[in-house]
């Protein structure tokens, strides 16, 4: 499968701060790929390198088969880019902005432009400086989708937006997902879970993992064991058991390598036969909270 974005051992240092520490990503064409992690994890730094806004200290990055250091001019006609704090010409109206941008993109679709203006309820004659944060984001996204980009790059697009606006933006993206690769950074896990196909978790510049969201959801389970008498935390247990605790006759933990056959067998090998075993699916937020609290790399 061809990659829309590929990075290899990407490092970025700002004086004494190492914002990225050997980041390697493979973003397949057609994916809705989410780069997630806490604030300060390095997500925006990675995107700025991909968009040739800043240079990497070392390593390499390619976007649509082109080295990111070469992304400029006509290459930008295939990329839609929207960032959280994107600068826009405040004196322009929404209509003037679209009129200004249209000639720069040979693939600009006026029918799609009209459709996006209607879908996002954009006020054509209102100046950008007078728009709410959510409406500004809609205007930025509409101007980045109207030319059918092969790649859509979004840096924290949902920050500070009310739920209705977030839903409208997500729907606008999903309506075009079949023709574009979408690469989005966010710390809003609840939103990401609703539409991403792939996910990568970045923490302090380190990539903790990268995989399909369905695979991640399948391998994480909250486990609860009930015994006939008081239970204790064993000294030795599989490395994939995170946040293990015992209270009275109940043991709880998260298994980050859940397998319907192996996990019960491992439990019996460590504890003997419990009176009851339950395995519950986890939300994306619960998965990342567990990982952060565990402080392990076993995931």
Predicted regions, residues:
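ABC transporter nucleotide-binding domain
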Residues: 167-258, 278
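Generic alpha-helical secondary structure signal
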Residues: 73, 111-114, 167, 214, ...
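Residues that cap or initiate secondary-structure elements
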Residues: 18, 31, 55, 229-231, ...
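Short, Lys/Arg-enriched, disordered terminal segments
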Residues: 1-2, 298
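C-terminal coupling/interaction segments
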Residues: 249, 255-299
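ABC transporter nucleotide-binding domains
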Residues: 2-7, 12-203, 208-209
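Short loop/turn segments at beta->alpha junctions
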Residues: 93, 212, 280-283
């Amino acid at each position: 499968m061809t990659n829309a974005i590929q990075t290899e051992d990407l490092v970025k240092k700002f004086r004494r701060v190492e914002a990225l520490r050997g980041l390697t990503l493979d973003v397949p064409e057609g994916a809705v790929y989410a780069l997630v992690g806490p604030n300060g994890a390095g997500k925006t730094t990675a995107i700025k390198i991909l968009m040739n806004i800043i240079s990497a200290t070392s390593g390499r990055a390619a976007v649509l088969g082109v080295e990111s250091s070469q992304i400029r001019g006509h290459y930008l006609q295939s990329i839609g880019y929207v960032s959280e704090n994107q600068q826009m010409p405040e004196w322009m109206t929404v209509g003037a902005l679209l009129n200004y941008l249209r000639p720069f993109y040979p693939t600009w679709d006026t029918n799609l432009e009209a459709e996006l203006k209607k879908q996002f309820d954009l006020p054509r004659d209102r100046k950008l400086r007078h728009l709410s944060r959510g409406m500004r984001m809609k205007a930025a996204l509409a101007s980045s989708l109207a030319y059918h980009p092969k790649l859509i790059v979004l840096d924290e697009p949902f920050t500070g937006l009310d739920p209705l606006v977030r839903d409208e933006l997500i729907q606008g993206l999903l309506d075009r997902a079949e023709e574009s690769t979408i690469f989005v950074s966010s710390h809003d896990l609840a939103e990401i879970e609703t539409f991403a196909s792939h996910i990568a978790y970045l923490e302090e510049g380190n990539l903790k993992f990268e995989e399909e969201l369905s695979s991640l959801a399948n391998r994480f389970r909250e486990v609860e064991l009930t015994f006939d008498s008081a239970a204790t935390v064993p000294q030795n247990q599989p490395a994939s058991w995170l946040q293990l605790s015992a209270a009275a006759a109940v043991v709880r933990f998260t298994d980050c390598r859940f397998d319907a056959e192996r996990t019960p067998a491992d439990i019996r090998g460590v504890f003997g036969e419990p009176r009851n075993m339950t395995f519950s699916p986890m939300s994306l937020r619960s998965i990342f909270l567990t990982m952060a609290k565990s402080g392990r790399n076993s995931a």
